[in-house]
Regions:
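A short, internal acetyl-CoA/4′-phosphopantetheine-binding micro-motif in the GNAT/acyltransferase core
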Residues: 8-27, 157-167
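Acyl-donor-binding surface of acyltransferase catalytic domains
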Residues: 19-81, 183-221
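Residues within well-ordered alpha-helical secondary structure of globular protein domains
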Residues: 97-100, 201
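A conserved beta-strand-loop-helix scaffold within acyl/acetyltransferase catalytic domains
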Residues: 2-13, 106-159
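A short beta-loop-alpha structural element at the N-terminal edge
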Residues: 81-98, 105-107
């Protein structure tokens, strides 16, 4: 049954779950509730029919997310710095870069201003500081790959860098670090140009249908399009 959930870091939009099961009365009720709570609505949609249904009711397509898996094979990479070995000042720089990256890629649904990014990263027990790596140039971070452990798998959460070439080079190095035979799961969003370059450059395997993020702004003139 479709429900509304709210991300505490991005409370401007409530997310619709089980969006493919939506009917018109339920959607109207959700739009009315969101308007009352001064929120917009958002949904991740895989099926074209559902995309059309939501578009007919005032939703706009914002981005597309791809779900992928990279199989790690034998590869000799270049030396890099694991996050676990960073000094305190470089960890602080990494947190600042993560904040800038997250805000830049969430302009349609901006996060609240007081997120503790250090706690979000280093305070998460699933953060894998050993397999997460950065590239340093003149003692500054120019590219990063941040990996988490989830259900006995490695999972990419964020990756960013100064430019495409630098980031892709770091990814080639990563292939020489991850255990041979392991699998790296990831999602890639079209709002993140640098990460999408990684998705397009390496041989990722699709693990689920791509999803389109659709949003209904609370400032919409009508609850529904007639």
């Amino acid at each position: 049954m479709p429900e509304l959930i709210t991300n505490k870091y991005q409370p401007q939009f409530a997310q619709i779950t089980q969006v493919d099961d939506l009917d018109v009365p339920t959607l109207w009720a959700m739009q009315a509730e969101a308007r009352h709570d001064q929120q917009g609505l958002m949904a991740y949609v895989s099926h074209p029919e559902t995309r059309g249904f939501l578009a007919d009711h005032g939703f706009q397509s914002v981005s597309q997310t791809y779900f992928a898996q990279l199989n790690i094979r034998d590869f000799s990479g270049e030396p890099v710095v694991p996050v676990v070995d960073l000094e305190a000042d470089l960890k602080a720089e990494l947190v600042m870069l993560l904040r800038d990256h997250y805000e830049r890629t969430h302009r349609f649904n901006p996060p609240i201003p007081n997120i503790d990014y250090a706690k979000w990263l280093f305070g998460d027990d699933n953060f894998d500081a050993t397999h997460s790596i950065v590239r340093l140039t003149k003692q500054h971070i120019v590219a990063a790959i941040l990996i988490f452990q989830t259900d006995n798998h490695l999972a990419l959460k964020w990756t960013f860098g100064d430019d495409v070439a630098t980031l892709q080079a770091l990814w080639r190095d990563l292939l020489g670090i991850l255990p041979i035979g392991s699998r790296l799961l990831a999602t890639f969003d079209t709002t993140d140009v640098l990460a999408m370059s990684v998705y397009e450059h390496f041989h990722w395997h699709q693990t689920a249908p791509a999803q389109t993020l659709m949003m209904w702004p609370r400032a919409a003139n009508n609850l529904r399009i007639q």
